[in-house]
From Swiss-Prot:
HAMAP family assigned: HisB
Name this polypeptide is given: Imidazoleglycerol-phosphate dehydratase
CC annotations in GO: cytoplasm
Catalytic activities: D-erythro-1-(imidazol-4-yl)glycerol 3-phosphate = 3-(imidazol-4-yl)-2-oxopropyl phosphate + H2O
Length: 206
């Protein structure tokens, strides 16, 4: 088992719409430093890193004077790429993870398979979240982007990710429950299992 592997990654991405830098350590303690210019997204990424026990630094500059959409989605792309790189050969990991997370009246569930086959399912959000906006002192966060964030994360990390809202009323609570559920599912999936001596697949590769 490659338990002493350096499971860290640094990924940078620059386009005409954004500049993103992500540093990720899968074997961290939840130390986070997030600055995207979209305050609620900063809050969600802080929760993600903290509850996954990842050390996570995200610095992003984007065209938030137009809207935060580009910055949020591009950050999710880079975070997914960093996760995929940090996983390395995947030897010794649990591979699968899932978590139910309540946030007051809301309940979300996330399930992860570090399979090397990207797939994404997102169900259960109330229709009202398509048009809901969480305002802040910086660029607003539109909850319609939740799906895009998790989809970009899944496909760029090459994982299968299912996220569902079982019930809820407050879009803030629903969104936060989803991010925390993804965090805890990822934490479980990437953890080392002392009983796994190689790649956790009957094919011998992920």
């Amino acid at each position: 088992m490659s338990a002493l592997a350096n499971r860290r990654a640094r990924v940078e991405r620059k386009t005409k719409e954004s500049e993103i830098v992500v540093d990720l350590d899968l074997d961290g303690t939840g130390v986070v430093d997030i600055d995207t210019g979209v305050p609620f997204f900063d809050h969600m990424l802080t929760s993600l890193g903290s509850h996954a026990s990842f050390d996570l630094t995200v610095h992003a500059k984007g065209d938030i004077e137009i809207e935060g959409h580009h910055t949020v989605e591009d950050t999710a792309i880079v975070l997914g790429q960093a996760l995929g790189q940090a996983l390395g050969d995947k030897k010794g990991i649990r591979r699968f993870g899932d978590a139910f997370i309540p946030m007051d009246e809301s309940l979300a569930h996330a399930a992860v398979d570090v399979s090397g086959r990207p797939y994404f399912v997102h169900t259960g959000e109330p229709e009202s979240m398509v048009s809901f906006t969480i305002a802040g002192t910086g660029a607003p966060y539109h909850t319609v982007i939740n799906r895009h964030v998790f989809e970009s994360l899944a496909f760029n990390a090459r994982i299968a990710l299912h996220v569902r809202t079982l019930y809820g009323r407050d879009p803030h609570h629903i969104t936060e429950a989803q991010y925390k559920a993804v965090a805890r599912a990822l934490r479980q999936a990437v953890e080392y299992d002392a009983r796994v001596t190689g790649v956790p697949s009957t094919k011998g590769t992920l």
